[in-house]
Amino acid sequence: AYRTKATPLSVSRLAAAESATRATAEAMNDPLLAAQWHLVNRGDQFCEGGLIKSVRDADVQCEGAWQRSTGNEQVIVAVLDEGVFVDHPDLKANIWVNEDEVWRSRDDNDGNGYAGDRHGYNFVKSSGVISWNDVNDSGHGSHVAGVISAVNNNGVGISSIAGGSGAGDGVKIMVCQIFSGNMGAS
């Protein structure tokens, strides 16, 4: 569980390497990976309705990264954006969970000053309830969370940079909602 007074851990390269999962693009079975030219670009994809041909290797080099690691569940990445659809089938297994908190609770069970922060916190509404479907939201928070840690190799949707091997072992997403529709938090 998340603690605000935690002592930083020192992790050696060896320990980090041992806890990481590995794969290649060929091993991923996510149906939309072929359209994710920004992750793996073999130069055979077309963009803009087939008018623009992609450029081989004009990507973020995910194949090389995946050979080293597809993610590590001990890593928590905070997404500061609109809300994230925490129950999305391609995200749910990689959403951070604060075990001490209860979803939609108004109580601050862990004493960190944020009531109900089970998956993060909605700073716009000062609530642990994350909203992702406001009529004015664009879905950007869920999109960003998906690029970072959609569950890899689960036969659903997209692949991600650090979504693990498909066994819930990807980096965890902590939602820090700072935008909602036309509203923001500072």
Q: Predicted regions span which residues?
A:
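Protease zymogen maturation seam
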Residues: 1-76, 86-94, 122-127
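Subtilisin-like serine protease catalytic core
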Residues: 54, 59, 63-185
